């Protein structure tokens, strides 16, 4: 029993750390794309002489901004790949965990309600009451950090628009447009191909537990 509890704890820590790492990368990516500016002072600045003679492309007047945007796109692709890999690993195990936690919340709430109607020892009641928050905390942990990834992903398009794109060249704007189109698609972790780790899912699980509890309580009352 102790080994199973420790294994579950280590698994939770492992997945939470990975989710935090992805959320942190998205936060850093938001800051990076919003900070991109043209070092040359805008598209109307003087073009170097070599550009006029044809030795340098005129659109490369601010190459650092373009290169920075290409780096942002590459970094974004790595984050997308990481989310897909993490989703693949969490798909079945976390779905089963959330489902069992929903059942455990229902059962513990039902047993606590029944015990309150009877004369039981305080230690028994304490065990039931103290166990219930553990399942709620574990479920909320995954959903809250999953929501963090969603929130950071939704910021990407706004951060891109907040960059210094008006003062950058055409190549930069094209890459930025492609990035914004891709960033408009939601970044989220889905388990069991039906549950997205988010605040809404957490509320759904609690609502499911309450529905089951209400059904069991009505059956118990009819006896």
Which positions does each model-derived feature cover?
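Membrane-embedded alpha-helical segments and the immediately adjacent membrane-proximal loops
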Residues: 1-223
């Amino acid at each position: 029993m102790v080994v199973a509890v420790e294994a579950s704890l280590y698994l939770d820590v492992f997945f939470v750390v990975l989710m935090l790492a992805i959320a942190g990368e998205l936060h850093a990516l938001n800051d990076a794309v919003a900070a991109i500016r043209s070092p040359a002072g805008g598209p109307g600045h003087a073009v170097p002489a070599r550009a006029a003679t044809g030795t340098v492309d005129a659109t490369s007047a601010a190459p650092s901004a373009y290169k920075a945007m290409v780096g942002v796109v590459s970094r974004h692709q790595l984050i997308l790949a990481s989310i897909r890999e993490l989703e693949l690993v969490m798909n079945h195990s976390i779905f089963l965990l959330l489902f069992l936690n929903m059942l455990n919340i229902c059962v513990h709430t039902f047993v606590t309600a029944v015990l309150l109607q009877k004369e039981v020892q305080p230690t028994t009641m304490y065990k039931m009451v103290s166990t219930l928050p553990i399942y709620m905390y574990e479920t909320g942990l995954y959903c809250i950090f999953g929501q963090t990834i969603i929130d950071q992903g939704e910021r990407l398009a706004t951060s891109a628009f907040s960059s210094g794109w008006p003062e950058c060249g055409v190549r930069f704007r094209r890459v930025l447009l492609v990035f914004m189109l891709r960033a408009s698609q939601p970044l989220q972790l889905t388990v069991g191909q039906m549950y997205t780790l988010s605040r809404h899912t957490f509320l759904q699980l609690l609502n499911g537990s309450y529905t089951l509890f209400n059904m069991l309580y009505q059956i118990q009352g009819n006896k």
